[in-house]
Every structure is written in C-alpha cells, then in structure tokens.
UniProtKB/Swiss-Prot annotation:
Record key words, sorted: Cell inner membrane, Cell membrane, Membrane, Transmembrane, Transmembrane helix
Name of the protein described by the UniProt record: Inner membrane-spanning protein YciB
Membrane-spanning residues: 3-23, 49-69, 76-96, 119-139, 149-169
Membrane topology listed for this record: Multi-pass membrane protein
InterPro entries, per the entry: YciB
PANTHER family in UniProt: INNER MEMBRANE-SPANNING PROTEIN YCIB, INTRACELLULAR SEPTATION PROTEIN A-RELATED
Similarity comment: family membership: Belongs to the YciB family.
Pfam families referenced in this protein's UniProt entry, alphabetically: IspA (PF04279)
Lineage, opening ranks: Bacteria, Pseudomonadati, Pseudomonadota, Betaproteobacteria, Nitrosomonadales
Organism per entry: Methylobacillus flagellatus (strain ATCC 51484 / DSM 6875 / VKM B-1610 / KT)
Cellular-component GO terms for this entry: plasma membrane
Amino acid sequence: MKFLYDLFPVILFFIVYKLFGIYEATAAAIAATIAQIAWAKITTGKVDNALIMSGVIIVVFGGATLWLQDESFIKWKPTILYWVFTVGLLGSQWLFKRNLIRGLMEKQITMPDPIWSRLNLAWAIFFLLLGFLNLYVAYNYSTDLWVDFKLFGTMGLMFVFVIGQTLLLNKHITEQDKK
C-alpha cells in the first residue's frame, strides 16, 4: 500500500496529463505532493526527508513550469530528484561515514560492510544514470513519450534494478536473514 501511496503524485500526473495536458498535470502533481506531506504530518507527526525533498523540487520546478508556461522545467524535476538522491547517498557515506541504504535495510538483512558500501554505490550510480536517461528521453522524444517513460519506464527500470540487486546480494545475506 505504501508503494501506491508513494507513487500517487506520479500516477495522478499521468492520468491528468492524458486527460487534460502538461500544465494541468503539473498542477495536480504539486497539489498531490503537498497533500501527501500534509497527510504524513497529520497522521504520523513527521514527514520523511525524501518526501520533503520531492515536495520542494516539485513546487519549484512545477511552479516554474506553470508560471512560465514552459514544460521543460517539469521535465527536469525527476532528474534533479534522482541527482539529489545520488548526492545524498554518496555524501552521507563519504562525508559522514553513514550508509543510507544500510540504514533502510539492516533490520531486515545482515551483510558485511563492504557489501553495504557497494550496494550504496550501486544505488547512487543507478540514480545518476536514471537522471541522464530522463533528460535524454525528455529532449529527444515527444512529451507524450516522456510522460509514459516517467511512469512506466522508470518504474520498470527500478523493478529490474531491485531484482538484479536481490539476486546479486542473495549470496551475501546470512542464513538467519533468509528464514
């Protein structure tokens, strides 16, 4: 259920785009993200840092799209978000000696430190490349195709990446974690 909750603004963007257009979809995504932040604050009393960052980026880039009536700003939004994730993953590990991927997953699985570092680096590289791929699609194909890619392409790539990581990491997960 959390997966659908997290994807709500993207799915709403896709639906509204198909029905009305890019500017209406951008406004809907901004509203949905603000609603998500408010809902998280009301129901749990806290808001996840990734959601706050996503909210700031959608308001800034979505707002610029609406204000200037230029869709290129909203097309940059996923790339900026992916690159912020890249900087966050690498910066936290290299500057603060804190592995964010490990922090998210270590309660579920146990692995040696070097494997956690490689996993963190793999995710950082994945987000970096996903940002470049988003720009490639945004500037070399139609807006219709970019919107489809934004939902289905990135979700598909994420799914394949997670499955690949799971298969590669399976040999490093302890027997206790597999039970």
